[in-house]
UniProtKB/Swiss-Prot annotation:
Residues 244-260, 298-323 have a biased composition (Acidic residues). GO terms for cellular component: nucleus. This is Enhancer of translation termination 1. It comes from the Eukaryota. PANTHER family: ENHANCER OF TRANSLATION TERMINATION 1. Residues 1-38, 242-272, 287-328 are annotated as: Disordered. One of its GO terms (biological process) is regulation of translation. Residues 26-38 have a biased composition (Polar residues). The keyword Transcription regulation applies. InterPro entries: Nro1/ETT1. Belongs to the ETT1 family. It holds the Pfam family Nro1. The lineage of its organism: Eukaryota, Fungi, Dikarya, Ascomycota, Saccharomycotina. Its main location: nucleus.
Length: 488
């Protein structure tokens, strides 16, 4: 993510300030803001009232949400505008009416303010202290809003979103493979505790929506992003340390190359004995190769092919990084609790989204797609167990793998892929061939679980072939390889 500052004035400088009587800004703000804020010009829709400052703020916020989010220019503009509105409200108030005047700022104001502050942390990831201050300030803002609007669903979702993002940017980012639970607790980095707390906040938003029968918030990709962020976090945990290990391997390879170069530079001329030995070895090797040539050519070719296949398999199967039990992420990685939480609440999200008559078709497809993919992923283990026990001679006589018999593995895998197909079909986009191919690939996976040349298998293959042919024609041959593999 971009770290360069394209904001107003000088580089963003985190500065946490204590709010007193709703009048003092708590947000870390860029310096030189007053003179440069006016330089930010955003074209707002004609429907936005030029005299409605909150409407203008919402327009500015929407501009950022709809952008590539690769610059903090608009974010700084939003924060400065929020600061100004807050100061202006307090300045125009007096005496006991102060709280009433401050309350005129709607819940949306606190949401926008908090999100802008948390998003700004993305542009300062090289300074963990600044990241911490941005998240602290954003949480203070959303909590201020919740004090005034405790039943506002958007604010509760906003808090959950900030907490999840904070876990990744502020806490997980500081962990190493050698990090320990004890060290994490000292630094107030109880990742599991913070994740549990964030998920409880999300659940409270769900509960409020159900109690009030207000499901409008679920029609926003902003809040769907929360579940995606949870999924991404779990993916980070599953693959934690891989990048660190790859970097170490690259460094070792570079060091070896340097050592070889140094050795070559330091090496002197060969002695007569060295030369004689080398010539004798070369002659013997040539004689052996001449005698064996032809008689072993086919055998060698087969061995080479087998070695190449094994190398390809090794490349495809990345070795899993094992975390020690003392690692802060170990307890999250080794339980299925959070994957199940994601699945359950994604299903709830889809159910709530369907309550709306004007639910976003794009969002419906995306949620269905993610659910379909999650069921396919879950089906990988039982599918592999079935294939291994059924067709791999090396496992002949073995009745169970991963706690599953051949029949159980087949049944479980079939059920999961059938479920996946249900969601993938609901995610189909008539204008997007890739969504068709997702369905075809799931059909092929399901077909492979039936008896060879059975009626069920042949029907699934035929259906998949039709879909792949259609997708291939629509994309000028993009899926020809997939089609050839099926027909071959």
């Amino acid at each position: 993510m971009a770290k360069r500052t394209l904001g107003l004035g000088n580089a963003a400088r985190a500065k946490k300030q204590k709010l007193e009587q709703e009048g003092k800004s708590k947000s870390p703000t860029p310096s030189g803001s007053e003179d440069t804020t006016n330089q930010l010009t955003i074209e707002l829709p004609e429907t936005v009232d030029a005299n409605d400052e909150i409407a203008q703020l919402r327009g500015l916020y929407k501009t950022y949400i709809d952008s590539e989010r690769d610059s903090d220019l608009i974010l700084n503009g939003i924060i400065h505008e929020c600061d100004r509105l807050l100061r202006e409200k307090v300045a125009n108030s007096s005496g006991s009416k102060e709280n009433q005047v401050s309350a005129e700022l709607p819940a949306m104001f606190y949401k926008i303010y908090a999100i802008a502050l948390s998003e700004l942390a993305n542009f300062h990831t090289d300074d963990i202290d600044q990241v911490s201050e941005f998240f602290d300030a954003s949480l203070e803002r959303v909590n201020d809003g919740l004090e005034k609007y405790p039943t506002d669903i958007d604010l509760v979702f906003t808090k959950a979103k900030i907490l999840i993002n904070q876990i990744v940017l502020q806490y997980v980012s500081q962990l190493k493979l050698e990090s320990s639970v004890e060290e994490a607790h000292i630094k107030n980095m109880d990742i599991k505790g913070k994740l549990d707390a964030a998920l409880r906040v999300y659940e409270s938003a769900e509960k409020k929506a159900k109690e009030s029968e207000d499901y409008l918030a679920f029609n926003s990709e902003e809040y769907w992003d929360i579940l995606e962020a949870v999924d991404d976090l779990l993916d980070i945990v599953d693959n934690f340390g891989r990048q660190e290990e790859e970097e170490e391997e690259e460094e070792e390879e570079e060091e070896e190359e340097e050592e070889k170069e140094d050795h070559a530079k330091k090496g002197g001329e060969l002695t007569e004995l060295d030369v004689a030995d080398a010539e004798a070895f070369a002659a013997a090797q040539e004689k052996i190769e001449g005698e064996e040539k032809g008689s072993e050519t086919s055998d060698n070719d087969e061995e080479d092919n087998e070695e190449e296949e094994e190398e390809e398999e090794d490349e495809d199967e990345e070795e899993e990084i094992e975390l020690p039990e003392t690692h802060p992420l170990y307890i999250i990685k080794t339980t299925d609790e959070y994957n199940q939480w994601w699945r359950d609440h994604t299903l709830t999200y889809l159910s709530n989204l369907k309550q709306l008559s004007n639910a976003s078709p794009r969002l419906l497809r995306e949620v269905n797609h993610r659910l379909g993919q999650s069921y396919l992923q879950e089906a990988e283990v039982p599918s592999s167990v079935f294939t291994t026990l059924r067709y791999d001679e090396d496992y002949s006589g073995i009745e169970e793998l991963e706690g599953l018999s051949e029949d159980d593995a087949k049944r479980v895998a079939q059920e999961l892929i059938i479920k996946a197909l249900e969601y993938l079909k609901a995610a189909e986009d008539k204008d997007e061939p890739e969504s068709w191919v997702n369905i075809a690939e799931a059909m092929i996976s399901l077909a492979n679980l039936y008896e060879v040349e059975s009626k069920e298998q042949e029907q699934l293959y035929q259906d998949a072939e039709k879909i792949l042919t259609k997708a291939n024609n629509a994309t000028n041959g993009k899926y020809q390889d997939a089609l050839d593999n099926l027909l071959g």
